[in-house]
């Protein structure tokens, strides 16, 4: 084993140890939460639905037993159920000693989730009739063993790789050895700006790895779509992945708009005919051979119910039916995967049995800066070269264990490669979203002042003679934060009132008719879930906001990643005598928050508390300077 190989293997073994710490920490936290957290709190947190109405059970097109349920209460609470997450069903019953919860002895996997409807695939032997008859039925998220198992398997495989492409990429990513490039004259793409053209050309020249670093509003997705389109002129098929289902949906939809055939493994987070049209399950159902396959599957299920005389004739018939079903499944899959130019999935979804044995020339990972390194290796093992796109100055991957975080588990593969191989990185430098004054602080602090505004957005605004960025100081208002629990964080009731007062005042200045005519939209952001829920309740109850509810979104910073609004109002919450700001000291979150605004940014928070931190002191000074104070 040479020095480079030894170094990379050692680093990945350390990654595995840190992942084990995170796994054990999260599993213990889940166990503790399950045992000690009341149902009402789980529902409020979005981790459980109760009560449920059982809608139906059926076999889906992939021959999986599925259960459909809807929640009948607390429909205003945003939930955390999404495709691929494990869940368990329970019943709430009344006993002499009070209410008790009994869990059913099986787990399922979410195959579809929207606002109030959930479809869960369950084992064939799941007691569906009992579920249907249960009063007080509920469902809650279960600990996600699968994602960890896939990450551990991926790390073990890459650690053990010898004398193959995976081993080469592993050693390259952990060394200072330059990545290989092809040499050819740059290709012109007149519809892209100079940095975007450079990024696409760098992707095309890369033999090993390329990185598209896209600060807010710089057209990262546009650039990535063009790079994929051009790559497909040279390769028959590529794999496109992202950490979240939402990110996979977004890039998939843009690729379809570009005229590229996409096959989406897994179900989308939002449902419309366009999104569903390129999912594997919908394409499978639409195949001409599917009705025949469905009939054979029904015959197999019917035959299994014949318990009396399972003689040789029964077994021969069952074998014939199974053989024919497998033959049809293989034929359908061969055609579906053969016709698609892009296979799209989450990083963990790339481990699907549907992709068993498949290799790709190029893997594109979008939002790579939000993914744990171990998750990236799940997909990388299927590819010869890798293109990463994202922004490590925005939201990081979620790491809950402080020990794992301090050990470096939160350091992403994208960050490692950027640090070791700056020559493979292209920074996109023209943003098309924000007024110049909103953008400038972020550009200076996070991107060395290299990001500029496109002329068409530089001076965009809503009101004449209006300062695009405002800070409303709550220091003298009596606003104080309150701790409301580990999962929800903190609230600041007075600040919530001041936040909505600021929005009311601005709406009044704009005028109701103009807001409607110009479809002006608003985002209200807070770092804390409890404050978000408080603000949502206040918006719902306030008569003033009744005409505007369709244009106002209230969410956490994470919930706004990748989105933008004409007006953004940020409630910082923290207000204390000690200058404690908690995870607001992770400045990447604030970079996301302040760069969601196109034309107006209003920050509401305690100057006395926040400006004890250098970043917020600088930001407040910048706001004052912009206002000419």
Q: How would you label these PLM feature ranges?
A:
Residues 77, 109, 333, 555-556:
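Short, conserved secondary-structure segments in the cores of folded domains
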Residues 234-236, 244, 334, 348-629:
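Conserved helicase motor core of SF1/SF2 NTP-dependent helicases
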């Amino acid at each position: 084993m040479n020095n480079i190989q030894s170094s990379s293997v050692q680093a990945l073994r350390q990654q595995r140890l840190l992942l084990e710490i995170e796994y054990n920490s999260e599993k213990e936290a889940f166990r503790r939460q399950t045992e000690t957290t009341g149902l009402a709190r789980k529902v409020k947190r979005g981790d459980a639905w109760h009560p449920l109405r059982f809608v139906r059970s059926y076999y889906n097109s992939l021959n999986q037993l599925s259960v459909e349920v809807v929640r009948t209460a607390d429909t205003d609470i945003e939930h955390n159920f999404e495709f691929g997450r494990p869940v368990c069903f329970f019943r709430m019953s009344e006993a002499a000693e009070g209410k008790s919860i009994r869990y059913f002895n099986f787990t399922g996997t979410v195959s579809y989730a929207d606002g109030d409807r959930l479809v869960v695939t369950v084992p064939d032997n799941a007691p569906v009739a009992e579920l249907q008859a249960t009063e007080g039925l509920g469902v809650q998220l279960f600990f996600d063993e699968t994602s960890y198992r896939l990450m551990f398997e991926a790390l073990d495989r890459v650690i053990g790789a010898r004398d193959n492409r995976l081993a080469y990429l592993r050693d390259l990513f952990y060394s200072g050895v330059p990545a290989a490039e092809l040499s050819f004259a740059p290709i012109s793409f007149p519809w892209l700006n100079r940095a975007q053209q450079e990024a696409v050309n760098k992707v095309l020249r890369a033999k090993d790895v390329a990185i598209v670093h896209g600060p807010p509003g710089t057209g990262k997705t546009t650039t990535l779509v063009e790079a994929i389109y051009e790559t497909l002129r040279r390769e028959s098929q590529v794999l496109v992945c992202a950490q979240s289902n939402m990110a996979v949906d977004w890039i998939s939809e843009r690729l379809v708009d570009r005229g590229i055939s996409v096959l989406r493994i897994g179900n989308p987070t939002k449902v419309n005919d366009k999104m569903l049209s390129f999912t594997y399950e919908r394409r499978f159902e639409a195949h001409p051979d599917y009705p025949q396959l469905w009939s054979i599957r029904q015959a197999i299920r019917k035959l299994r119910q014949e318990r009396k005389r399972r003689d040789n004739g029964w077994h021969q018939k069952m074998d014939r039916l199974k053989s024919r079903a497998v033959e049809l499944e293989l034929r359908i899959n061969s055609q579906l995967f053969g016709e698609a130019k892009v296979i799209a999935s989450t990083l963990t979804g790339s481990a699907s049995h549907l992709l068993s044995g498949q290799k790709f020339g190029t893997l594109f990972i979008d939002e790579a800066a939000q993914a744990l390194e171990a998750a990236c290796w799940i997909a990388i093992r299927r590819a010869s070269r890798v293109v990463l796109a994202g922004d490590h100055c925005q939201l990081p991957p979620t790491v809950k264990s402080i020990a794992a975080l301090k050990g470096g588990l939160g350091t992403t593969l994208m960050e490692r490669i950027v640090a070791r191989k700056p020559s493979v990185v292209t920074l996109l430098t023209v943003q098309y979203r924000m007024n110049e004054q909103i953008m400038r602080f972020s550009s200076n602090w996070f991107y060395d002042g290299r990001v500029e505004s496109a002329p068409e957005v530089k001076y965009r605004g809503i009101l004449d003679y209006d300062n695009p960025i405002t800070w409303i100081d709550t220091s003298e208002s009596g606003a104080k934060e309150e701790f409301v629990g580990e999962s929800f964080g903190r609230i600041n009731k007075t600040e919530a009132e001041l936040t909505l007062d600021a929005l009311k005042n601005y709406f009044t200045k704009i005028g109701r008719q103009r807001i409607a005519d110009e479809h002006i939209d608003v985002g209200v952001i807070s770092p804390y879930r409890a404050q978000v829920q408080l603000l949502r309740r206040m918006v719902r109850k306030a008569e003033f906001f009744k005409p505007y509810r369709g244009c106002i979104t209230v969410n956490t910073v994470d919930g706004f990643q990748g989105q933008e609004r004409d007006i953004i109002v940020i409630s910082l919450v923290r207000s204390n005598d000690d200058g404690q700001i908690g995870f607001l000291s992770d400045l990447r979150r604030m970079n996301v928050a302040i760069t969601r605004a196109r034309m107006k940014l209003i920050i509401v928070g305690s100057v006395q508390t926040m400006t004890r931190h250098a970043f917020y002191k600088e930001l407040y000074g910048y706001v004052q300077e912009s206002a000419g104070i």
